[in-house]
Amino acid sequence: DCEKQMHGKINSAFYGYAERVWFMSEKQKNMILEKVTALKDENCAVLNSVFSGGDLRFMLSIKDNEKDNKYLILDSVSPVKPSALAVAYAEENNLEYELISDLQYHELLIKMSTSKGLIFLPQASDTCPRLVMEAKMLGCQLVLNEHVQHKDEPWFETMMSCYEHMDSRADAFWSYYE
């Protein structure tokens, strides 16, 4: 009942007067539209995320690296993104895995490009996790749950459709303001 509390009413007014509200996933947009009646669908757009052209080109250049048999798991104690469930999944399914943390960004991308997959099982809604998009664009097999909100969107279907969609996001954003 957040929308009935004072902070919810303030958010509703903020959304209602906005010229454009950008969302990270269709599910996120639909959840907000359902709760915030002041917000109109025609003022909404789903951007997902924006990557730099350089990072997209880097991912494209390493996506075909030889893969090992390991699934990567984000080493996290966050209550929303705990690693414990992913570790349990890997162990129950006899999957070789490696916990990852504290890697520089391009090191992480290289690690993903040489790994079989990613296990990512958040405990609450995660609108559009970049780690999952990066793993997809790098050819990783994905083990995800229903909390990864963008996982069923058409652009996320294949490695190349994901890459092409992400490559269009900066233009999609800026073209609105031109």
What are these regions (language model features)?
Residues 17-19, 68, 114-116, 139:
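Short, well-ordered alpha-helix to beta-strand connector turns
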Residues 121-178:
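Catalytic binding pocket for nucleotide-activated donors in carbohydrate/polymer assembly enzymes
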Residues 105-115, 137:
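Short acidic alpha-helix that forms the nucleotide-activated donor recognition element
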Residues 10-11, 105-109, 131:
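Acidic, amphipathic alpha-helical patches
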Residues 2-21, 113:
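Membrane-proximal helix-turn-helix segments that form the acceptor-binding/catalytic region
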Residues 13, 89, 111, 134:
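Hydrophobic/aromatic ligand-binding patch that stacks against planar heteroaromatic rings
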Residues 16-43, 82, 178:
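A short, active-site helix/loop in glycosyltransferases that binds the activated sugar's phosphate group
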Residues 49-108:
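Conserved catalytic-core segment of nucleotide-activated headgroup transferases in glycan assembly
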